[in-house]
A protein has these predicted regions:
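Compositionally biased terminal segments of proteins
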Residues: 2-204
């Protein structure tokens, strides 16, 4: 069978998300409410969990072919990929392969440098990661989000991707999604956070 592709040449995101998003808002609310009652958690958590899964799929399957590789890490990716733990989270942790940003450097290489040289290399890696996260990655996730909302017959401007203003390293994104569940106390915000960087070790 042929695999559907995005305009940039990468594989398309899972069409099941579009099927669900195409349902009437009331039906989606009922689905979130039913799941929340079964799992004993606020319906806003269920809604956010859907968008966490959507974001993981958009990063993994919706990226342009030939772009920098991503290492998915942390409890959110672990729970979604392998079901080893059960958790609700708003954060997705990823590491960008330094080699693919043109800043190849393993831990041993960095340890051999003097303090000044090491800081320069780490600053260069950080700058490359910032440029990728706030440039191509942000644009690609926004494109996938707009496509998903349009395909579902929803307002394509109802979702947006923006830089996280609270991240001093400027390597995190917030994916704001169109909320259909009831308003809560503001504790569960309708946004999924992508925390990224390129300094972390790629091996466990």
């Amino acid at each position: 069978a042929e695999v559907a592709e995005t305009p940039e040449g990468g594989p398309a995101v899972n069409p099941a998300f579009n099927t669900f998003l195409s349902a009437a808002a009331a039906d989606r609310r009922d689905a979130f409410l039913g799941a929340s009652q079964r799992l004993g958690t606020p319906e806003q958590n269920i809604e956010k969990d859907l968008w966490v899964s959507w974001t993981l799929d958009a990063l993994f399957n919706g990226a342009a072919r030939g772009g920098p590789r991503l290492l998915f890490k942390g409890g959110t990716s672990l729970s979604k990929a392998f079901g080893l733990i059960s958790r609700f989270s708003e954060d997705i942790d990823i590491t960008i392969f330094r080699d693919d940003l043109g800043e190849a450097a393993d831990v041993e290489d960095l340890e051999e440098l003097s303090g000044t040289q090491r800081r320069k290399r780490l600053d260069a890696i950080k700058s490359a990661a910032q440029a990728h996260v706030n440039g191509p990655m942000r644009a690609q996730v926004q494109a996938r989000l707009t496509e998903a909302l349009e395909a579902a017959g929803l307002d394509p401007t109802a979702g947006r991707v923006e830089a996280d203003p609270d991240d001093r390293d400027q390597q995190s994104l917030l994916i704001w999604y169109p909320k259909v569940t009831a308003a809560d106390d503001g504790y569960i915000r309708p946004a999924v956070k992508i925390e990224s960087g390129a300094k972390s070790a790629l091996d466990p």
